[in-house]
C-alpha cells in the first residue's frame, strides 16, 4: 500500500532559488500545453503533447518525468471537464484555467529523478536548468539537496516526491512511500459507519449492541469561525481593490487546514482504536459519492457539505485500517435513514418500507410499526451494517431490540475522549 509522509521545508537561499525556478517552470509548461489544447482542432492525448513539447524551453527546464507529470495532470483536468460537460454534473463546466503569470506550482519527482542518501533527498537538475541557474544566479550544481526531517520514519520504498510551494515562501514536501502489508485480520466481525455533519461518524458492530458517535460539532465550529473571519477580510480586500489574498487571509487558511486535519486524523484514529477493540476485520462505510451533487439540503447545509471533506476523512480511515490488517468497503446509503433497523430485514431496506415521517427530528427515529425509539444516525449505521452483511451472505448474530444508547465521543481540544466504557459481547 502507499502512504504519504509530509514535512515542512524552510529553504536555504540556494534551495529557494532552485525550487522557485522549477516550480515557476511547471506553471509555464502548464500554460503552454493548456493553450495548445484550447486552440487545437483535434483531441490531444498526454502522449501527443509529450511528443510535441519535448523540445520546449519550459519542458527542458524540468526533469523529463516531472515535465511528463505536468502534462498528465493537465490531461486529467481536461478529461474531468469533458466528463462534467457530458454528464451534466455541473451547471456550467469550464475548461482548465491558466496559471497566473508569476504563479509557482507543485512539482513532482518520480523515482528516476531522485535518490535518498544519508537521510537527504538528492534531486537531479536538468541540463537546461543548470545552464539557467548558472547564468542568472551563479549556482553551479548538478543536484538539489534537501535534508529529511529527523522525525520522519521512512519504513518503505519512496516512489514519488511532490514539493508544494506555500504562500510564505516555504514548502511542504510529500513523500509517497510504498509499504508492504502482508497481515490480514480474519475474525468475521464487521464495523459499520454512518458519516454525517453534526455527528461526524456513527459506529455499529456486528458482534455487539454497542454503538458510538464521534461528535462533529468542533469541525462545524472551526469552519464557521474561519468562514466568518476570512469573509470579513476578503470584503476589505475587495473594497481596497486588491486581487491577491493578504498575509493575514493566507494565515487563516493555513490555520483552518491545520485544525481540520487534526480533527479528522484524531477521529480516524479513534475509529481504528474501536475497530481493534471490537476485533473487527472489515469496516463498511456509507457511500456518499453523490451526496454533494445530487442533493439540495438548503444553502446553509449545502455549504457545510462542501466544506466538510468526506473524501479526505475516508482516505484517512482506509490507510490506517490497512496498516492494522482491516479491509474497508463502501455501500450505498440509500434509504438507510428512513427504514427501521429493528424489525425490518436487510432485504426490506428500500423505497417500499422507507418512511420519512419516522425521523421525527434531528437525532430521533421513531418507528410507527414496531414502536422502536432510537438515535437516528444509529439506525442508519445499523442498516448500513445489515445491507453489507446481506451482500456477503451473512446476517446479524443477534436481534437489535436491546440496542445500547450510543456513547458520544466529544472533542476535548486534543482528541475525542470516551465518556463511558461499553461492554463488548463475545
Regions found by a protein language model. Name each.
Residues 39-55, 156-158, 165-314, 395-426:
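Substrate-contacting helices/loops that form the catalytic groove of nucleic-acid
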Residues 114, 119-123, 170-173, 200-201, ...:
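Hydrophobic residues embedded in beta-strands of well-ordered beta-sheets
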Residues 47-166, 303, 307:
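Acidic carboxylate diad motif detector
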Residues 9, 60, 64, 254-261, ...:
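Hydrophobic alpha-helical scaffolding
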Residues 304, 308-426:
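Positively charged, low-complexity nucleic-acid-binding target-recognition regions
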Residues 1-69:
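Gly/serine-rich nucleotide phosphate-binding loop at the start of the catalytic core
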Residues 33, 70-81, 378-388:
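Stable alpha-helical structural segments in soluble proteins, enriched in small hydrophobic residues
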